[in-house]
Amino acid sequence: MSKYDIIVLGSGPGGYVTAIRASQLGLKTAVIEKESLGGVCLNWGCIPTKALLKSAQVFEYLKHAEDYGLKVKDAAHDFDAVVKRSRGVADGMSNGVKFLMKKNKIDVIEGFGTLKKGKKVDVDGKEYSADHIIIATG
């Protein structure tokens, strides 16, 4: 069984910032994440949505370019490319969180964490213990 000072369940903005600060204070820290580092907002909600909105905004600007004295021929959208860009933005930011975990020597445990008696967490059949467990699941 691996022993930590702090285990953080969830790697969204609350979880990963908490883990970074704990590690900076000298505590042996782990983050348990069931999906992608960064949480729902970064990977599926806020960030990719804003990337999609930006693409729509740029397309709208192109449609009205003549209002600004500019001529744009054949402005067209490619929905697959728009979605690919949105995913790329989110993936880049998730990789940024991954970099911060590594830089701050935080163990990232992939899987679904289940709280157990005695300050323990089970992740897919493997048990971890900590002096403190922080629930940051959103």
Residue ranges and their predicted role:
Residues 1-12:
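Beta1/beta-strand and adjacent pyrophosphate-binding region of the FAD-binding site
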Residues 15-16:
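N-terminal Rossmann-fold NAD(P) dinucleotide-binding loop
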